[in-house]
């Protein structure tokens, strides 16, 4: 991706459907045979990878105009192979549905972005609490249970994937399951809403205690994927960093309160409605500190983009990453553009240098890091070339087209 610094962005831009809601919802289709229909499904590499995995399990996936259809048949095999799972961590989310519906699942241990260990132990402990037998051998996890039984399970640490996987498994268990210290992310709420449309009985989603009353059967439904709050936040920061005026539509500002609060604290004027947010031109902004944490606090998935904004702020900002231990890989690349950042294990000190970034060749290391490099490139003088943008395609739908529509000089070269 070649990015030229080109002054303020101006205009209106819409967000796509949320990747992090779409993936668990697609895997949840395994709970109900028949035809599931989705709207607002983003066209992303991770959606392609999920389709490939579902197809390998006997499903049929296809686009019908703007709708995405998943036809679920009884799988000929209950194994999700290494070749498919290594592309994307979220693939492990097929385990809960298969285990609940068919009593067995064999899933390769996961891959995805290299931003920390993100262990699957909490998922497996949750399955065990529902009565499943788990064995691990030769890089695969084998789970089996004639019939899952409801129970109470406390997550030792907050885990989004673990909450989703165990919640899906519990929908078909005998009796009531209570998940304590559950994750509260909006994407979990979207998943629970789809499961309830299929006939599940879930309450408490969006709080730290989720209650699932098991049912005998689920049936396919139709659902619109929620807007992507991380993409919305990235686009808002793009407007801010270029001193532009950008309105982001088809979003839910209530999902981004932590980001909006910090941007206002830095000096930006931001106006919101129920489903839009506008950032106004700001000549200079102050450095502010952030600490990432599970929702509703500052999202780790916006940490890299916010760091880009802080590289050109007035003053010094301290960025603390509490969610993943290896999430400062963008620091060395931002430094190549002239940013002044001192990283330690989980803390980065960013000394703002407004107007001092200059274009250079940089390399994306993960999905959100790639976005931060594009944002920095928008305000660096000269040309910034971001390589390995396949990371970007995993989670952003046509980001260069959206930024171009706002006046950015950005193009993709093969």
Curated annotation (Swiss-Prot):
Q: Which Gene3D superfamilies match?
A: Enolpyruvate transferase domain (3.65.10.10)
Q: Which SUPFAM superfamilies match?
A: EPT/RTPC-like
Please state where this protein is localized.
Cytoplasm
Report keywords, A-Z: Cell cycle, Cell division, Cell shape, Cell wall biogenesis/degradation, Cytoplasm, Peptidoglycan synthesis, Pyruvate, Transferase
Q: Which GO terms describe its biological process?
A: cell division; cell wall organization; peptidoglycan biosynthetic process; regulation of cell shape; UDP-N-acetylgalactosamine biosynthetic process
**What top-level class of enzyme does the UniProt entry assign?**
transferase
Pfam families reported in the protein's UniProt record: EPSP_synthase (PF00275)
Summary of the function given for this chain in its UniProt record: Cell wall formation. Adds enolpyruvyl to UDP-N-acetylglucosamine.
Instruction: Supply the HAMAP family for this chain.
Output: MurA
What protein name is recorded for this chain?
UDP-N-acetylglucosamine 1-carboxyvinyltransferase
- State the organism of origin: Bdellovibrio bacteriovorus (strain ATCC 15356 / DSM 50701 / NCIMB 9529 / HD100)
User: Which gene specifies this protein's sequence?
Assistant: murA
